[in-house]
A protein has these predicted regions:
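Class I SAM-dependent transferase core
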Residues: 1-94, 98, 110-125, 189-210
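Conserved nucleotide-cofactor-binding alpha/beta core module
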Residues: 74-194
Length: 216
């Protein structure tokens, strides 16, 4: 199996035709071996047009969605980014190659260790990995220019806006039902914020279980 060739085909057949044309974004995909971030039994599908389950109800969305996140994030090389829910570090490494400083959180110690190891293996020197609950963001290192949460979630914590600069962005995916989610981009202003729809996501993944609601 020629995984490097598969990576090239993925870029040409999945990303470019869907308006992912930024050379910096395409280059980080080309220079990062996704197969090294997933289990041996899934390496043969890592560049195919499908989600890749990692653990429980979490995993990597299809390659196009990861590329769309980076495309709409418009990451600059002087920016500080918080990536919430790093899994094994694949998207975190892609982000790290585009920004000045990246902080990555996960609530799973195994994933935290995976990200640390994969940062070393990919010579990422501008990243820091912390075990933290997803809804908390990361206090003490803010403000961030950008927060990325790539796993669909039922409940978005608006308090995360307090952790970004004025003019800062949050890219996140709001879970509508079991199958459908919608990606949004928030931009923070002095006294308010905007929320713009980006793209639909069809995935069973979710960051945390939906909170139960009781009607009295």
């Amino acid at each position: 199996m020629n995984l490097e060739k598969n990576r090239e085909v993925m870029i040409e057949n999945q990303l470019r035709p869907n308006k992912i044309t930024n050379n910096d974004v395409l280059q980080v995909f080309m220079s990062t071996s996704k197969e090294k971030f997933i289990s041996e039994d899934k390496k043969n599908i890592c560049y195919s047009d499908q989600d890749i389950s990692i653990k429980d109800q979490r995993g990597y969305l299809k390659n196009l969605h990861l590329a769309q996140i980076l495309h709409f994030a418009e990451i600059k090389n002087n920016e500080k980014v918080l990536h919430i829910g790093g899994l094994t570090g694949y998207l975190s490494v892609l982000i790290a190659k585009l920004c000045n400083k990246i902080y990555v959180t996960d609530n799973d110690q195994e994933f935290v260790e995976n990200i640390i190891n994969n940062f070393k293996n990919n010579e990422v020197t501008n990243g820091k990995v912390i075990k933290e609950e997803f809804s908390e963001g990361l206090k003490g290192e803010e403000p961030y220019d950008l927060i990325i949460i790539d796993c669909p979630q039922y409940n978005f914590n608006l308090d995360l806006l307090s952790q970004v600069n004025v003019g800062g962005r949050i890219i996140y995916i709001e879970k509508i039902n079991e199958e459908l989610s919608k990606a949004y981009k928030m931009i923070k202003y002095q006294d308010n914020f905007s929320k713009v729809f980006l793209f639909d996501v069809f995935s069973n993944f979710y960051l945390t279980k939906q909170e139960e609601r009781f009607n009295f």
